[in-house]
């Protein structure tokens, strides 16, 4: 007699989190995990930011009740997320055309956005960059959309294939949903410049496409305001859009699932109707978000002293990543790599697309205990003064 679940097949491991499981099972000393997108300090620890610590102490001392939040989350949290994205002087916010819902991390924001879009655009398709974050395709396919790609990375130049990207967008049918990495592209670290973003926004508007901007690393590229430039360019061109954002990395609150989904609507009335439907999506997924992480983020975003401290800590993290990029490029060269890895310095954010093949990545793991994603992506934020020499020598060895 077969059981209810007898026919259930074993699902493949997640390409990133599954790698983490392999790393944890590895008993070798000196192993290095460059797979998962987490920022570590120079001692190899996930930092607890001072601004977050102060907010948490205040939260504990207040002994506030932990009742249910509104479906859309904490008002101050949502207002803070909007301001970070669009600016304190945003005319769209002033006009009531912007709505935000607290979400379970950036992934949760993408999911509720995808579910909502499936309701209003059931016959649309989704375009993601080639390559993109591994979960983008699975997430939108799970929501019921066919997913295709647009050209993005040029392996020959280690840069952006902007002509190919524009051509794909210009050929896309109206109402195609286009997922765009607003800054610190994952996995390549290759971003568009201001002029290129303006061209993309013009094409998106002219072709009546639906931009879904994903910004999980605001502050890790050039700065909080600089990294929001793409969002603000679309806003300046009055483009209706969706934006998924995350504070997991920038606040070092990975386990608290602190994200937000922000939408720019055509009018205040439209924004209200959209929010009502978004709340229905949330209610049938998880009812409402948790209080703790959102309260900490809201406190920091809305307390000038804590905000200034957080911005300084974020700048320190950004500077350390830049230092690791420079040192890695120099040390790989010094170790005798056959190719120039100087392109790593030009990339932005937590990740680098090394150009290593899947076979070379396997060799890194099997022979050197260095774990990276099969695409060749490494998390530069996981490098430190204690492991960078080992990593550089291993990369040079497999790249010869």
Model-derived segments and their meaning:
Residues 311-367:
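Conserved PLP-binding catalytic core of the aspartate aminotransferase-like
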Residues 2-73, 80-83, 87, 284, ...:
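N-terminal "arm"/small-domain region of PLP-dependent enzymes with the aminotransferase-like
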């Amino acid at each position: 007699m077969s059981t209810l679940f007898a026919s259930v097949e074993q699902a493949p491991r997640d390409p990133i989190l599954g790698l983490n499981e392999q790393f944890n099972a590895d008993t070798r000393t000196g192993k290095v995990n460059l797979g998962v997108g987490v920022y570590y300090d120079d001692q190899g620890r996930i930092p607890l930011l001072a601004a977050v610590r102060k907010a948490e102490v205040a939260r504990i001392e207040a002994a506030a009740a932990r009742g249910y939040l509104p479906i859309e989350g904490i008002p101050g949290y949502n207002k803070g997320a909007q301001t970070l994205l669009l600016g304190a002087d945003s005319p769209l916010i002033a006009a009531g055309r912007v709505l935000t819902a607290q979400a379970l991390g950036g992934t949760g924001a993408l999911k509720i956005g995808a579910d909502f879009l499936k309701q209003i655009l059931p016959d649309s398709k989704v375009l993601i960059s080639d390559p993109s974050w591994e979960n983008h395709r699975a997430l939108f396919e799970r929501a019921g959309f066919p997913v295709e790609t647009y050209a993005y990375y040029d392996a020959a130049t280690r840069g952006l294939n902007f002509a190919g990207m524009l051509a794909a967008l210009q050929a896309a049918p109206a109402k195609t949903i286009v997922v765009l990495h607003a800054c610190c592209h994952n996995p390549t670290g290759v971003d568009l410049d201001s002029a290129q973003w303006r061209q993309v926004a013009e094409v998106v508007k002219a072709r009546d496409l639906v931009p879904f901007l994903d910004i999980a690393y605001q502050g890790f590229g050039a700065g909080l305001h600089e990294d929001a430039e793409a969002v603000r360019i679309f806003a300046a061109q009055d483009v209706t859009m969706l934006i998924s954002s995350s504070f997991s990395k920038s606040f070092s609150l990975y386990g608290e699932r602190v994200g937000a989904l922000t939408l720019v609507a055509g009018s205040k009335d439209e924004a209200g109707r959209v929010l009502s439907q978004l709340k229905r999506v949330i209610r049938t997924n998880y009812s409402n978000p948790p209080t703790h992480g959102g309260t900490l983020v809201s406190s920091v975003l809305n307390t000038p002293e804590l905000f200034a401290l957080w911005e300084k800590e974020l700048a320190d993290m950004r500077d350390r990543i830049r230092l690791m990029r420079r040192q890695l490029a120099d040390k790989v060269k010094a170790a005798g790599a056959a190719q120039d890895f100087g392109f790593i310095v030009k990339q932005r954010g937590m990740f680098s697309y090394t150009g290593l093949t899947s076979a070379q990545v396997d060799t890194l793991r099997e022979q050197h205990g260095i774990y990276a994603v099969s695409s060749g992506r490494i998390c530069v934020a996981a490098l430190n003064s204690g492991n960078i020499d080992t990593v550089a020598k291993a990369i040079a060895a497999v790249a010869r």
